Design a protein with these regions (language model features):
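Protein-protein interaction and targeting regions used for scaffolding, dimerization, and localization
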Residues: 131-133
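Extended, leucine-rich alpha-helical cores of fungal transcription factors
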Residues: 1-4, 15-83, 90-107, 111-128, ...
């Protein structure tokens, strides 16, 4: 399903082909779910489809929100919120599924955070937890892929957006309280920006070291 999703979202040069693939992808997804065939591959495919497909072209199709709920349901059924916390080297091939599962779970959180921003006032699909923080840190530590290094930053940003929304949701706050909250959020954002700079510098040094050792 992951390969199917990649082919679908990358076929944007042909509108007709992409629409056909999109419809077929949705049919296969629903058929698998109805048969109880829930897997990490299915979840990864859905995440790629939600993140990269031109959904505005399928006006009669299932909404992004409903597709995201399918992702969260699959993640729950697969137990992705309670995976092992053991940090091992990427060389341990037995842990490949766990690492991919953790990336998928973080993907669920990232997408739900962004989609929830477009639906103010509604209950959050997925909230920040210590489990998400642990997964991000573990993947950044093992650093199997270059993108793993940014997981802690993405979690920080998503949690920050969640914090902003909850702070100012539906409440007429007194001016002094608002100023206090704005100051707190501003300080937190500056902290995130500093962490991003440190992570970029660390990544740059690592790349330079890797390049030198190759020669």
């Amino acid at each position: 399903m992951l390969t199917f999703a990649v082919l679908t979202v990358s076929s944007y040069d042909s509108v007709l082909l992409q629409q056909t693939l999109s419809q077929d992808f949705r049919k296969v997804v629903m058929a698998k779910i109805m048969r109880g065939e829930k897997s990490l591959d299915l979840l990864q495919g859905l995440l790629v489809f939600i993140a990269w497909h031109h959904h505005y072209m399928d006006t009669q199709a299932v909404s992004i929100t409903m597709l995201l709920q399918l992702c969260l349901g699959i993640a729950g059924d697969l137990g992705l919120d309670a995976l092992s916390r053991t940090v091992r080297s990427p060389m341990h091939k037995d842990d490949t599924w766990d690492r991919e599962a953790k990336r998928a779970y973080l993907g669920c959180y990232y997408l739900s955070s962004n989609i929830d921003l477009m639906q103010p006032g509604k209950a959050r699909s997925m909230s920040h937890t210590s489990t998400l923080r642990n997964y991000a840190s573990e993947l950044a530590t093992s650093w199997e892929n270059n993108s793993d290094a940014v997981f802690p930053i993405l979690v920080d940003v998503c949690q920050y957006m969640e914090d902003v929304e909850e702070t100012f949701r539906n409440q007429p706050e007194q001016a002094v309280v608002v100023r206090t909250q704005v100051k707190r959020l501003s300080d937190k954002w500056e902290s995130i920006q500093l962490a991003i700079k440190l992570r970029v510098n660390e990544f740059s040094k690592q790349k330079q070291y890797t390049t030198r050792t190759q020669y």
